[in-house]
Amino acid sequence: MDLGISGRTALITGAAGGMGEATARALLGEGVRLVLTDLDGDGLAETAGRLGAGDRAATVVADLTEPDDVERLKREAGEVHVLVHTAGITGAKGDPLTDITDDDWLDAWHSDFMSGVRVARAFVPPMREAGWGRVVFVTSENVAQPYDDEAVYNAAKAAVLTLVKGMAQRYAPDGVLVNSVAPAFIESPMTDYMMEKTAEEEGVSKEQAIEDFLEEDRPHLVLGRRGKPEEVAAVIAFLCSERASFVVGSNYRVDGGSVASIDL
């Protein structure tokens, strides 16, 4: 299927692996020029090498919690038609009142929410002026199904979704369509780190830690496995395309059936 975006330029944040890299690969296959950014410079270079896109993929190492870095990213990226914001952290875990500090809350706020505000502020106004744009944020299953030990992540991702809804309503008349995807337990550097840490703490293999997590913490994930980054990227690529020209403010769940509730 031709998504109708060949020749466009997409900025992908959090591009050093996982969903960011998978999205880059999907869009590259549609003839899109890429600007890839991440705080992890080595990981970003490795992603670019695996993509093998040559001059069709530029890389910019940037910390999106730093306004000056976002301004530099804007200068180096040039004209951008598509923004995909996957960057973020899981944040501290534990009792939201007794275990989580003010700094923990602020770290998640800046990494998961304000980073998105900053890149949108930098790149969406020119899209509005041009009369065309696509913006896709990554939220989480936690928005619909908060977990009691992930309060900072729950709150930050819920804030992202409300940002998406507000931006979608305001900018759609100008041709800029804003949507989001809500993954569950996806294969990524982030979940790899979580599972490796759990495995070390419990004295088991990473594979056993994943199996235990699915059985004990995510029994409602009906497919019983981690999702693949490519499965999320396929939905993101659709939302970036001309094929999604009547989709505004939607939050697509790519969660293996983890969330069973109905959106009204």
Segments the model singles out, each with a brief description of its role:
Residues 145-151, 173-174, 224, 242:
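Active-site loop immediately N-terminal to the catalytic Tyr-X3-Lys motif
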Residues 125, 169-170, 245:
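Alpha-helical segment proximal to the catalytic Tyr-Lys
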Residues 180, 203-243, 247, 256:
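C-terminal helical subdomain
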Residues 94, 236-237, 248-264:
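Short C-terminal tail/terminal secondary-structure segment
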